[in-house]
Amino acid sequence: MKENRIRKNAEFRRVYRKGKSFSNRLLVLYVYKNYILKDINRIGISVSKKVGKSVVRSRVKRLIGESYRLNSSNLKKGHDFVIIARTACNGKRYSDIEDSIKNLFNKAGLVIYDEKNIT
């Protein structure tokens, strides 16, 4: 998954400016269709200093990344995602973050439904 990350500032800006946003209480999701890399999804995670000290921010990033990793096989391919953590993420459990991410991907219409992964 490390090679499927958005790292450059210009890539983040493109997703912010041209992408579509979806939000809930814990997270904000920006989605941009990537016409060059059609067979993979890329993800960028942003957690501001408002969320907490570095230990808290790192934990939130790890929880978001792990939740995405476990659910990425159920998503349509060829998109860039930027997930922004809101201050309400501070102190939340993994299950709360995972439910929030699933909710956002459902709102965006990016979940592939089949018999195995009905949520």
UniProtKB/Swiss-Prot annotation:
Assigned EC number: 3.1.26.5
One Gene Ontology cellular component annotation held by this UniProt entry: ribonuclease P complex
Classification via Pfam families: Ribonuclease_P (PF00825)
InterPro entries: Ribosomal_Su5_D2-typ_SF, Ribsml_uS5_D2-typ_fold_subgr, RNase_P
Keyword Zinc-finger: no
Key word Transferase present: no
Domain of life: Bacteria
Gene Ontology biological process: tRNA 5'-leader removal
Record field: transmembrane: none
GO MF terms, alphabetically ordered: 3'-tRNA processing endoribonuclease activity; ribonuclease P activity; tRNA binding
Alphabetized SUPFAM superfamilies for the sequence: Ribosomal protein S5 domain 2-like (SSF54211)
Catalytic activity, as annotated: Endonucleolytic cleavage of RNA, removing 5'-extranucleotides from tRNA precursor
Keywords, ordered alphabetically: Endonuclease, Hydrolase, Nuclease, RNA-binding, tRNA processing
Family, similarity comment: Belongs to the RnpA family.
PANTHER family per the UniProt record, alphabetical: RIBONUCLEASE P PROTEIN COMPONENT
HAMAP family: RNase_P
SUBUNIT field: Consists of a catalytic RNA component (M1 or rnpB) and a protein subunit.
Role: RNaseP catalyzes the removal of the 5'-leader sequence from pre-tRNA to produce the mature 5'-terminus. It can also cleave other RNA substrates such as 4.5S RNA. The protein component plays an auxiliary but essential role in vivo by binding to the 5'-leader sequence and broadening the substrate specificity of the ribozyme.
Protein name: Ribonuclease P protein component
The species this protein was found in: Clostridium acetobutylicum (strain ATCC 824 / DSM 792 / JCM 1419 / IAM 19013 / LMG 5710 / NBRC 13948 / NRRL B-527 / VKM B-1787 / 2291 / W)
Gene name of this polypeptide: rnpA
